[in-house]
Structure formats: structure tokens, C-alpha cells
């Protein structure tokens, strides 16, 4: 009887061990933006495809809207392993690595074609920098072109002076300084409240963000289509979590990441067109700036690109040379 009991205990332990081994890895994916945002929807589809195709080896569960970690917390959470995977707005991480700010240099890349060339030129150095911080880069997707929102009409450089301006990274703070606007740091989740309370009167962001926030309901009547830059969100994985996957699963994740990146760029292009129309349909004035303002913004962009190149050093110079054939 004792022998039978010992055999049963041993078998139970073996079955339990097999079940644990077959359970696979589970990754909770931190997303800063709401479930309806195209970045979050794209990430959710990526997670679903990996989960379904991995044969139980990897399950990815998405947590949109900052429900797992807020936007400003995600990079650190993934780096420290509190979250195995997450998505973060790249240019908010300039203090981590200046290369992550390259896509937010005003008027450096003003079309999707140029944005893709800049991405290809900068990606190797960005991947290398993230690897040194214990992170694995999966994919990056741009927001639609950044335009200037304002509560009041802007017809001259003088109209910018003292305008309360939403800043969210070092680039937008510097733009405010160079144009005479007054910067206030506001995260994406706080945009509507900031405009409704008068904390800010203007911002640079995509037509998609304005549409999703129904920004016209907060007294914002103008969108100037200046196509300042195409900032990206990137998806990163904690390297220790990554190394727990077998080679086949790692290959699957990278394959699905490439598909998500392609789809994300297509969704961004579609949103760039459709969301500007949505702003106009809601009663906002959607327009280009006049030639004097355009020239002023381009001068600001040239100044900032030079400053960024100095800050980024030889790595930044090599990226700009690969992108445009010349350094700053």
C-alpha cells in the first residue's frame, strides 16, 4: 500500500512538472493609450497573433489606457522587469538616449517616405542602445504628421508669443523657447482637462490625437497642418524575459512584430488623411500656415537639428549622414 502511495505521489509530481513546463510564458503588455487608439489596437492584434501561433509557449495580455503602468512609467517598468513588454513614445526618452529623439526634430522628415528613410538610418543605433540597457526592440510605428492646434487663430510669429503650449518632451519644450510660447508639461491623458481649464491654449500633436480627444469640445478651433515630424511609438521587451523563450518562439515574435510594424505604418497613413477630415467635419478650421510662419518654423527646425546632432555626438552624426548624405 505504501509503495502504491509513493508511486502515485511521484506520478503526481511528474504530471505537475509537465503541466508547468507546458504552461509557457505569460507577458503582460503595458500600453499607454486607450484601446480605441490605432497603436493599441495594432499591439492587441500583434499579441493575439503571437499567442495563437506560439502553441502555448507564449501568451501576451495587453493592458491599454495606462491600466498596468502609465506612459511615463512604461520604459522603466520594462527595463526593470516589472512588465515583460510595453509600448512607449520614443522621443519622450531623450534623457535615456538622444537617438530616441531623432524622429521629433522639426521638419527633418515631413513625409512618410522621409520618415521611413530616417527610421532605417537610425534603427541600428537605436537597437544597439536599447540592447545595452537590457531591452530587445520589436517594432516602431509613427503617429500621423504633427500639426499645430490652437484655441485662437495664428497668422504671424507675433501670435505665438506667450501662447500657453503643451509640452511633453525636450523637443517640444525647446520649440516653445525658440518661438516664444510658454511651455507646460502635459501628458496625453491630461490633454482634454488642460485645454478645458485653460492650462494650455495650443499643442503640437497628430490629427489622430485631436480626433480621439474630441479636442473641439475643449474650445480648440484651429488645426494647422504643418507636418512638423512623425514621432513613433516603439515596442520593447525585457531581455531576461526574452531569453526565457526558445529560438522558435523568438523567431515567431520577430515575424509578427514585422507584420505589426507594416500594418501600423499603413494605419498611420490612413489616419493622417481621415482624421484631418474628422477635425474639419467637427467644425475646426484645418489649414496651412502662411509662408512667413512656415519659414519661421523651418528655421526653428534647423536650429534644433543642429543642437540635437551636437548632443547625440558621433552616433547622431552618422545617422544624419546615412539619412541625408550630409551631417550637421
Describe these PLM feature segments:
Residues 9, 23-116, 122-328:
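N-terminal secretory/targeting leader peptides
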Residues 16-23:
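Sec/Tat signal peptide C-region and signal peptidase I cleavage site
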Residues 1-8:
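Bacterial N-terminal signal peptides that target proteins for export
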Amino acid at each position: 500500500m505504501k509503495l502504491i502511495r509513493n508511486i502515485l505521489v511521484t506520478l503526481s509530481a511528474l504530471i505537475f512538472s509537465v503541466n508547468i513546463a507546458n504552461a509557457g510564458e505569460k507577458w503582460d503588455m503595458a500600453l499607454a493609450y486607450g484601446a480605441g487608439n490605432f497603436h493599441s489596437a495594432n499591439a492587441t492584434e500583434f499579441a493575439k497573433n503571437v499567442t495563437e501561433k506560439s502553441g502555448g509557449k507564449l501568451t501576451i495580455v495587453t493592458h491599454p489606457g495606462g491600466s498596468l503602468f502609465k506612459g511615463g512609467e512604461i520604459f522603466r517598468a520594462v527595463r526593470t522587469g516589472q512588465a515583460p513588454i510595453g509600448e512607449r513614445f520614443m522621443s519622450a526618452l531623450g534623457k535615456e538616449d538622444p537617438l530616441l529623439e531623432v524622429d521629433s526634430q522639426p521638419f527633418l522628415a515631413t513625409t512618410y517616405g522621409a520618415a521611413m528613410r530616417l527610421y532605417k538610418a537610425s534603427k541600428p543605433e537605436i537597437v544597439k542602445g536599447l540592447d545595452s540597457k537590457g531591452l530587445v526592440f520589436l517594432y516602431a510605428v509613427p503617429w500621423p504628421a504633427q500639426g499645430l492646434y490652437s484655441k485662437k487663430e495664428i497668422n504671424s510669429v507675433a501670435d505665438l508669443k506667450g501662447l500657453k503650449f503643451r509640452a511633453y518632451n525636450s523637443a517640444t519644450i525647446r520649440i516653445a523657447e525658440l518661438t516664444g510660447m510658454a511651455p507646460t508639461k502635459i501628458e496625453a491623458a491630461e490633454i482634454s482637462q488642460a485645454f478645458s481649464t485653460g492650462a494650455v491654449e495650443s499643442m503640437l500633436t497628430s490629427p489622430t490625437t485631436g480626433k480621439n480627444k474630441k479636442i473641439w469640445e475643449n474650445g480648440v478651433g484651429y488645426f494647422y497642418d504643418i507636418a512638423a515630424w512623425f514621432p513613433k511609438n516603439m515596442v520593447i521587451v525585457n531581455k531576461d524575459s526574452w531569453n526565457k523563450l526558445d529560438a522558435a518562439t523568438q523567431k515567431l515574435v520577430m515575424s509578427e512584430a514585422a507584420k505589426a510594424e507594416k500594418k501600423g505604418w499603413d494605419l498611420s497613413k490612413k489616419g493622417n488623411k481621415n482624421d484631418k477630415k474628422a477635425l474639419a467635419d467637427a467644425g475646426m478650421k484645418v489649414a496651412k500656415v502662411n509662408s512667413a510662419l512656415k519659414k519661421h518654423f523651418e528655421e526653428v527646425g534647423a536650429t534644433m537639428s543642429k543642437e540635437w546632432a551636437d548632443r547625440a555626438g558621433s552616433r547622431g552624426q552618422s545617422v544624419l549622414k546615412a539619412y541625408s548624405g550630409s551631417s550637421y
